[in-house]
């Protein structure tokens, strides 16, 4: 995992200071976008072992290449993460 990927992944889990943390990576050569926010049906094991099949996915890409996908069961939280990802590298 690159430094940028690590920063992005940590930032999506921690809303504080996200823009400042990512600012040094945001220049004309790096384009960060959350390309999709969608409801998906997938077997997903929670940390407590419960299985759920209706979850939400945010796919974050950099320069058109998928870097990581984040899954969650709470629509509001995932929408916030989607909006955050869209906002992170905007000037």
Residue ranges and their predicted role:
Residues 4-9, 65-91:
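Mixed-charge, Lys/Arg-enriched low-complexity segments
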């Amino acid at each position: 995992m690159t430094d940028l990927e690590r920063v992005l992944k940590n930032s999506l889990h921690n809303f504080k200071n996200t823009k400042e943390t990512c600012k040094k990576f945001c220049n004309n050569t790096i384009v960060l976008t959350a390309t999709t926010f969608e409801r998906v049906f997938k077997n997903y094991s929670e940390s407590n072992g419960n299985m759920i099949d209706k979850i939400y996915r945010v796919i974050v890409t950099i320069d058109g290449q998928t870097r990581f996908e984040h899954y969650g069961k709470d629509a509001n939280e995932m929408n916030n993460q989607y909006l955050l990802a869209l906002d992170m590298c905007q000037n």
